A protein has these predicted regions:
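Ribonuclease/tRNase effector modules and their secretory precursors
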Residues: 1-82
Length: 82
């Protein structure tokens, strides 16, 4: 299980975008894809069936402890590529 905290921005986006904590856990623990971005952060993506297969994209700073989710959103660009 990935340990993390949410930034203030991520908490706000979670509420605004109606992203459940279960979806966050599933994305971090069993991502469809995981990569280090050019920004140095880890990017996790996962298709969420409850959102008609929308792709949840989580950006996490792994250089701090505990790891911090910087932002999270449903990535329309990735959903189109499916």
């Amino acid at each position: 299980m990935v340990e993390f905290e949410l930034s203030a921005h991520a908490k706000s986006m979670m509420t605004k975008r109606k992203i459940s904590s279960d979806w966050i856990s599933r994305t971090l623990n069993t991502p469809d894809k995981k990569r280090r971005g050019d920004d140095g952060n880890m990017h996790y993506t996962k298709s969420i069936r409850e959102r008609e297969g929308g792709v949840l994209h989580i950006v996490m700073n792994t250089d701090v402890q505990p790891n911090r989710i910087v932002t999270l959103f449903f990535d329309r660009r990735l959903a189109k590529q499916k």
